[in-house]
């Protein structure tokens, strides 16, 4: 982050390459719309450059980035006056980035959409490479709660997928 503050675009590119999947997954879990999530993701990374000058390295950079992303995603929701999206709306709004996506991935995405919001965020963040401790810190939950919600979500996914 210090290198980015000094104008090092290679450091910025490296940060982007290491965090883009987790950031997009997290934003998408909030907005539930691919196009809006892409817009907020772009805004997040654009905000990182000037904000890097005031970055306080007390925590992990991913937590800082996800905080920026969360704030921008919530601002986006407020501007659209969307406060609650039903699961039916969520399933109708899911847009997939590739037409050649496998049927298994489609089924998994639908199964994940049936999880509670906090479970969905934990599963998406962890599958994007974010450690449970970082998720706990970011979501302001005890580690034990994150672990139990993650395990409960996996059991729900297994039940959903075996039922289909």
Predicted features and spans:
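A short pre-motif secondary-structure segment
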Residues: 122-123
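Sigma70-family region 2
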Residues: 5-6, 32, 43-60, 79-80
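Internal acidic/polar
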Residues: 75, 81-105
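Arg/Lys-rich amphipathic alpha helix in sigma70-family domain 2
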Residues: 50-57, 67-87
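DNA-recognition helix of helix-turn-helix
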Residues: 74, 133, 139-164
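Structural recognition of an alpha-helix C-terminal capping motif at a helix-to-coil junction
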Residues: 25, 39-46, 50, 59-71, ...
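Short, charged helix-capping/linker segments at alpha-helix termini
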Residues: 5-14, 24-43, 138, 143, ...
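Short helix-coil-helix linker/hinge
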Residues: 102, 112-119
């Amino acid at each position: 982050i210090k290198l980015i503050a000094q104008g090092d675009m290679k450091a910025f590119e490296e940060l982007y390459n290491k965090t883009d999947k987790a950031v997009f997954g997290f934003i998408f879990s909030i907005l539930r719309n691919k196009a809006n999530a892409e817009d907020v993701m772009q805004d997040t990374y654009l905000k990182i450059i000037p904000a890097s000058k005031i970055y306080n390295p007390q925590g992990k950079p991913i937590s800082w980035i996800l905080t920026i992303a969360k704030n921008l995603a919530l601002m986006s929701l407020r501007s659209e006056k969307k406060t609650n999206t039903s699961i039916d709306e969520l399933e109708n709004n899911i847009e997939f980035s590739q037409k050649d996506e496998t049927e298994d991935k489609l089924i998994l995405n639908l199964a994940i959409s049936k999880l509670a919001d906090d479970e969905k965020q934990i599963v998406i963040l962890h599958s994007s490479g974010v450690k449970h401790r970082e998720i706990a810190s970011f979501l302001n939950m005890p580690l034990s709660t994150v672990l139990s919600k993650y395990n409960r979500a996996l059991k729900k996914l297994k039940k959903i997928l075996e039922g289909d």
